[in-house]
Every structure is written in structure tokens, then in C-alpha cells.
């Protein structure tokens, strides 16, 4: 895979984290703007997760039937228009609806990127490519909160969504010019009825389900952190909105670094082995975070240490779980990618909503959900040990 293709796929993969992380510093501002509280603003985040979960179920079969390019172009165009609608939101209800539509467009890049990697790479190479994609898309959670905080303080919250529209427009142009069709020509286009019917077979595929759920609940812990951190950092511990991005970015840097380390680790033992090892690190750091949250330290830094370890470990967990789940999917790579992403973001939406539901003015809800996700990820990863990928 050449560098240009890798960069385009990385940018498309970044739609999800960029559209999430870019507006996180604006949560308190949006609450004041619309005369509500942060917990209700978090519903716009949950709506985005629900949109991604639903949309991926459709893009997968469409990519298997019509190829990778056409559904991708439609999705990126929809994301661009919905971003502009978010910028014009006169109410929180409008913003929540526009975020849902934005997710329906943005998930095209996430689904079809995984399918393209599966088209071009075997399982071991896929694990390495997914780790490299994390490096590209990992710039989003590092730079997005910083940029979002800067735009918030200089141009106001609508500029955040204007910037997302510009980014999506550039990605649309890049796909048109430089990303060819990658679906193997020897594969007959899957009929839509058969493509959607493939979901039943995938749901009964134990290796696919085990590794998909391991990655899904691990990702849910990440999004529990994303949903809870604006309140914990800014409201609970008084971190200025413009400084929030530095703290968020430090954790994201750990995620990116470990993803690059993972590309080397999988050479010895394969992705399944390192998935099982790193979910143990994820669980241990999540439990440590929960204990500290119950202790309620007066300063933020005791919570930041286990948070950093937890997020960094996901740099190994997520690419390996994805590579294992996508192994052997062949003709139905699009459907497999769609179902994988849908399950992951369904769980993520539930986790972010649970953090909001449990809100009690402390860091405990965020920490509890992260610890529970770590335990579930361990269970699914080790249950899947019996399967060879």
C-alpha cells in the first residue's frame, strides 16, 4: 500500500474521532448557549454514536454490491452538508438531529477503509496497516481538542463545524482524484439481498463475533472517557477549555505510540496473542482508575496516570481485534466491516449514555464504565483464544 493511499484512508478513518473530539471543549459553552446542562449536551454525542452504528449496517452491503468508491463519495458528501447544518443549529434538538445525519455520512469512511485494507492485505499485514492508520488518524484526538478549543475562544462554536465541512470537502476531492476501486475484479458483486443476508451468517460466526465484541467493548471504554472527560477535566477540576486539548492529546499520543509499537509486536505471536495480553493491561488500569475515582483526589493528576495507561493500551487492542475479526471475510469484507463497526458503536453509544445517566458530580461514572468495559473486553478476547486466525 503506497503512502498516498494510506494517508487518504487515515483521513477517512479520522472522520469518527475528529467529529467527536473537535467539539468536546465546547460542551459547557453549548450548554450555556442552549440554556441546558452538560448532561443534555452529551446526548448530541450519543446521537452521533447511534448514527454511526446504524449507518455502517447499510454501507457494508452497498460497498459489496456497488464497489468501494460510490458509497464512499455519497457518505463524505452527506457528512459535509450535515456539518454545515450543525453550524447553523438554532437549538439543541437541531444540533442532535444534525449530528445524527453527520454520523450517517461519516461512517462511510470508517466502513470502507476497513474493507479496502481487507481487499489489499492478509491478516498479518492488516494488523500492521491498521496500526499505521492509527498513526494518521491518531492526529485527530491529539490536535482536534486543541484546535476546537482555539476556534471556540476566537471564532465561536459554529466555526468548529465549519472546519469539519472544509476537511470533509478536501477528503471528497482526494477520493475523486486518487483513490481507485479496490474490490477484487474476480469477485462477483454481491446482490443487496445476499449482502444483508450475510449479517445472519456473520452473527453466527463465533470467531468474528468474539473478536468484534472484544474490540467493541474496549472502544466503548474509550468513548466513556470521551463523554465524561469534558465534565471531569473542565467542570470538576477547573481545567480551562483551551487547555483541555493538551490533557486529551497527551492520552491520545500514548494511543498512537502504542499502535506503532503494536506493528512490531505482532511480528512475534500474531495479533490474537497481543490482543489477549493488552486487554489485561486495559483492565488493570481501569480498575486502578475506579479505585482512585472513589477516593476522589483533590487534584487531577492521580486520575491521569491510569487514564493514560488505559487509553495507550487501546492502541494495541483495537487494531488487533479488528484484524482478527476481518480475517477470512473475503467477498463479504464490506458487510463484515459494516457489522463490526455497527456493533462497536452501538456499545459505544450505550457507554456514553450510561456515563450521562450515572452523572453524580464526580469522576466515578466515567471510571466505573471504563472498568466494566475492560472486564468485558478481557472476557471476549480470552474466550476467542480457541479460534485460529
Where are the predicted features?
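Conserved MFS/SLC helix-loop-helix module at the cytosolic interface between two early adjacent transmembrane helices
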Residues: 54-93
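Juxtamembrane intracellular "pre-TM" segments in multi-pass secondary transporters
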Residues: 182-212
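Structural signature of the two symmetry-related core transmembrane helices
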Residues: 70-84, 274-289
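Helix-breaking motifs and short loop linkers at transmembrane-helix boundaries and internal kinks
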Residues: 35, 67, 88-94, 105, ...
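A late C-terminal transmembrane helix in Major Facilitator Superfamily
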Residues: 324-361, 370
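Cytoplasmic helix-loop-helix junction between adjacent transmembrane helices
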Residues: 98-139
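Paired small-residue
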Residues: 78-85, 93-101, 301-307
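Helix-loop-helix hairpin linking two adjacent transmembrane segments in secondary transporters
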Residues: 94, 124, 131-177
Amino acid at each position: 500500500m503506497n503512502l498516498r493511499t494510506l494517508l487518504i484512508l487515515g483521513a477517512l478513518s479520522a472522520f469518527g474521532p475528529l467529529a467527536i473530539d473537535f467539539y468536546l471543549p465546547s460542551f459547557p459553552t453549548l450548554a450555556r448557549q442552549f440554556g441546558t446542562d452538560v448532561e443534555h449536551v452529551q446526548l448530541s454525542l450519543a446521537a452521533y454514536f447511534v448514527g454511526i452504528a446504524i449507518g455502517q449496517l447499510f454501507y457494508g452491503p452497498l460497498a459489496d454490491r456497488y464497489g468501494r468508491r460510490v458509497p464512499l463519495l455519497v457518505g463524505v458528501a452527506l457528512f459535509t452538508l450535515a456539518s454545515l447544518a450543525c453550524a447553523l443549529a438554532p437549538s439543541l434538538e437541531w444540533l442532535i438531529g444534525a449530528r445524527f445525519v453527520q454520523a450517517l455520512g461519516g461512517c462511510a469512511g470508517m466502513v470502507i477503509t476497513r474493507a479496502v485494507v481487507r481487499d489489499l492485505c492478509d491478516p498479518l499485514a492488516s494488523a500492521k496497516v491498521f496500526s499505521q492508520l492509527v498513526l494518521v488518524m491518531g492526529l485527530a484526538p491529539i490536535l482536534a481538542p486543541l484546535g476546537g478549543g482555539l476556534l471556540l475562544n476566537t471564532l465561536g462554536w459554529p466555526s468548529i463545524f465549519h472546519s469539519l465541512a472544509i476537511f470533509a470537502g478536501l477528503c471528497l476531492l482526494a477520493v475523486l482524484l486518487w483513490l481507485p476501486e479496490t474490490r477484487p475484479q474476480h469477485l462477483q458483486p454481491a446482490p443487496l439481498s445476499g449482502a444483508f443476508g450475510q449479517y445472519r451468517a456473520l452473527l453466527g460466526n463465533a470467531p468474528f463475533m468474539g473478536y468484534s465484541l472484544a474490540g467493541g467493548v474496549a472502544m466503548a471504554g474509550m468513548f466513556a472517557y470521551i463523554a465524561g472527560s469534558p465534565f471531569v477535566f473542565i467542570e470538576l477540576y477547573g481545567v480551562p477549555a483551551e487547555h483541555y486539548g493538551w490533557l486529551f492529546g497527551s492520552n491520545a499520543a500514548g494511543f498512537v505510540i502504542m499502535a506503532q509499537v503494536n506493528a512490531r509486536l505482532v511480528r512475534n505471536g500474531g495479533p490474537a496473542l497481543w490482543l489477549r495480553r493488552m486487554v489485561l493491561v486495559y483492565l488493570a488500569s481501569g480498575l486502578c482508575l475506579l479505585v482512585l475515582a472513589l477516593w476522589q483526589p483533590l487534584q487531577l493528576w492521580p486520575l491521569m496516570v491510569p487514564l493514560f495507561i488505559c487509553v495507550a493500551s487501546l492502541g494495541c487492542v483495537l487494531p488487533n481485534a479488528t484484524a482478527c475479526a476481518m480475517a477470512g471475510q473475503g467477498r463479504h469484507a464490506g458487510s463484515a466491516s459494516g457489522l463490526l463497526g455497527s456493533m462497536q458503536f452501538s456499545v459505544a453509544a450505550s457507554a456514553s449514555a450510561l456515563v450521562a445517566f450515572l452523572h453524580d458530580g464526580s469522576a466515578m461514572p466515567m471510571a466505573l464504565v471504563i472498568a466494566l468495559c475492560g472486564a468485558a473486553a478481557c472476557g471476549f478476547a480470552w474466550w476467542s483464544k480457541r479460534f485460529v486466525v
